A protein has these predicted regions:
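C-terminal "cap" of GNAT-fold acetyltransferases
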Residues: 23, 136-138, 142-149, 154-155, ...
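Conserved GNAT-fold acetyl-CoA-binding loop/helix
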Residues: 19-47
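Conserved acetyl-CoA pyrophosphate-binding loop and the N-cap/start of the following alpha-helix
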Residues: 116-129
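Conserved GNAT-family N-acetyltransferase fold
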Residues: 56, 99-101, 106, 111, ...
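A short beta-loop-alpha structural element at the N-terminal edge
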Residues: 4-19
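A short helix-loop-beta-strand connector motif used in the catalytic cores of GNAT acetyltransferases and
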Residues: 46-59, 107
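A short, internal acetyl-CoA/4′-phosphopantetheine-binding micro-motif in the GNAT/acyltransferase core
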Residues: 107-118, 142
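Conserved beta-hairpin
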Residues: 53-66, 83-99
Length: 191
């Protein structure tokens, strides 16, 4: 895996997070209605992100040729965003925003990775960074998001419940997942 660094994200980072979110949902949430995605995207910087106790941003260090001021991260394209919703930020100081995790207490509320960087351990690294501070990790995943369900199962998460509706009462069933840290060592294995 390439070198990753983490930082706590704040309002100055919201444009990065919004770009990552749009690219991710375009790649993984084809089952969600477009108007609902737009509503969530519109609320992300003003409602959802500020409601997080902590948002961790994973940065991928890139060689100068890769982080040369290009307007797009790997896999990005104008077709990923509804017109007028987001300005794509430039890479920052030789690094690209690779993913982020938003949390409240021991609950992961959001985890998104740049689609062009999936499979490189970024999501796992964000979960381990979070899990190192919490003996128990809770999260919800859309039941229709098969790739995410497999991702979490491979990292030791177990289904502990199901809701037929999402948190906003929409017909997108959620699976409630839980993972315990083994022996307090932050290994990511279930206890």
């Amino acid at each position: 895996m390439e070198r990753l660094t983490f930082s706590d994200a704040g309002p100055a980072d919201w444009p990065y997070l919004l770009c990552l979110w749009w690219r991710n949902v375009r790649a993984t949430h084809g089952f969600v209605a477009e108007d609902y995605l737009r509503a969530i995207g519109a609320a992300l910087p003003g409602v959802y992100l500020p409601a997080m106790e902590r948002v961790r941003l994973a940065w991928l260090e890139v060689a100068p040729a890769e982080g040369d001021g290009s307007d797009h991260a790997p896999g990005a394209g104008e077709g990923h965003f509804p017109t007028g919703t987001v300005a794509v930020p430039r890479p920052s100081q030789g690094r690209l925003p690779a993913g982020f995790l938003g949390s409240v207490a021991q609950r992961v509320e959001m985890l998104f990775v740049e689609p062009g960087l999936r499979g490189r351990g970024i999501g796992t690294a964000l979960l381990e960074d979070f899990g190192s501070r919490h003996p128990e990790t809770l999260l919800d995943v859309n039941e229709q998001n098969t790739a995410a369900r497999i991702f979490y199962a491979r990292r030791g998460f177990e289904v502990v419940g199901r809701s037929p509706l999402d948190g906003a009462g929409q017909p997108y069933p959620l699976l409630h997942l839980r993972r315990l840290r083994a022996g307090g060592a932050g290994t990511g294995q279930t206890a």
